[in-house]
A protein has these predicted regions:
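Small/aliphatic-rich secondary-structure junction motif
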Residues: 4-68, 75-76
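Structural beta-alpha unit
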Residues: 1-2, 73-91
Length: 91
């Protein structure tokens, strides 16, 4: 197989309802800018996340909207972390 092949950095950040998640989004945006890298913000729906309070659910939604506003591709993946592993090779 002939090369050279295009290569580059990509950043993946997994978000939750934690109040500090918005800070993590901003940090990831700065890192992506420094690396000139595309970035993806994900949340994984599990049995635990389906039991979040309305306030926690709203906070997670706000954090995902912030990531999108700052240039991230955003994904909500139903299921367990194992599904994430099937997604990452294509990123």
């Amino acid at each position: 197989i002939a090369g050279p092949w295009a290569a580059g950095e990509r950043i993946l950040v997994c978000l939750s309802e934690d109040p500090r998640a918005a800070g993590l989004v901003r940090y990831t945006k700065r890192l992506a800018d420094r690396l000139h890298a595309p970035w993806t913000a994900i949340s994984i729906e599990t049995r635990r996340t389906l039991q979040l309070t309305d306030e926690q659910r709203d906070r997670l939604a706000d954090t995902m909207r912030l990531a999108e506003a700052l240039g991230a591709e955003t994904l909500t993946i139903p299921g367990v972390g194992r599904r994430l592993l099937t997604r990452t090779p294509s990123m």
